[in-house]
Amino acid sequence: MAEKTQKSVKIAPGAVVCVESEIRGDVTIGPRTVIHPKARIIAEAGPIVIGEGNLIEEQALIINAYPDNITPDTEDPEPKPMIIGTNNVFEVGCYSQAMKMGDNNVIESKAYVGRNVILTSGCIIGACCNLNTFEVIPENTVIYGADCLRRVQTERPQPQTLQLDFLMKILPNYHHLKKTMKGSSTPVKN
């Protein structure tokens, strides 16, 4: 079965995915996305589509799991895709089950985002914040502190372009990478 699940991982050219990361199920990874070693992406209840320019750090867990009240053995629920937009950052040790996420969001270290939360764009979920409500988080919302207080920032967070460029250069020097899809044919020099 491990053979079958590995084949459904699609990595776009230009993405940097370390071999030490764990990716299971039907996962599509967009270009310029960087996935650190020990990051986990698990698609068990449906596919996960990750857009362009995302940064997924060590021990981050992105999981499309079955809701607590459904077990895959008893019922055959229709698979629901998890869609992640562009330029999102999943910091060290965060846990995300959000089924829909826009662009330019940051989930900070040890933060938890539940399955029924929809992140729009430009949101920051602060370190150690636990967000497990049925709601759509408005654009540019910052959730912070031990009490998960909220405020709206005037601008959305800057994309991590320089950090992505740096990691795309450095990670291949120290880690083996997973192969990308053969999208473009490059001539081989003899």
Curated annotation (Swiss-Prot):
Gene Ontology cellular component terms for the protein in this record: centrosome; cytosol; dynactin complex; kinetochore
Gene3D superfamilies (UniProt xref): Hexapeptide repeat proteins
Keyword Transit peptide in record: no
Chain positions with Phosphothreonine modification: T186
Record key words, sorted: Centromere, Chromosome, Cytoplasm, Cytoskeleton, Kinetochore, Phosphoprotein
InterPro entries linked to this entry: DCTN6 (IPR027777), Trimer_LpxA-like_sf (IPR011004)
Tissue: Ubiquitous.
Subcellular location: Cytoplasm, Cytoskeleton; Chromosome, Centromere, Kinetochore
One of the record's GO molecular function terms: dynein complex binding
Post-translational modification: Phosphorylation at Thr-186 by CDK1 during mitotic prometaphase creates a binding site for PLK1 that facilitates its recruitment to kinetochores.
Family of this protein: Belongs to the dynactin subunits 5/6 family. Dynactin subunit 6 subfamily.
PANTHER family: DYNACTIN 6, DYNACTIN SUBUNIT 6
Assembly and interaction partners: Subunit of dynactin, a multiprotein complex part of a tripartite complex with dynein and a adapter, such as BICDL1, BICD2 or HOOK3. The dynactin complex is built around ACTR1A/ACTB filament and consists of an actin-related filament composed of a shoulder domain, a pointed end and a barbed end. Its length is defined by its flexible shoulder domain. The soulder is composed of 2 DCTN1 subunits, 4 DCTN2 and 2 DCTN3. The 4 DCNT2 (via N-terminus) bind the ACTR1A filament and act as molecular rulers to determine the length. The pointed end is important for binding dynein-dynactin cargo adapters.
Purpose: Part of the dynactin complex that activates the molecular motor dynein for ultra-processive transport along microtubules.
Name by which UniProt lists this protein: Dynactin subunit 6
Upper taxonomic lineage: Eukaryota, Metazoa, Chordata, Craniata, Vertebrata
Gene symbol of the encoding locus: DCTN6
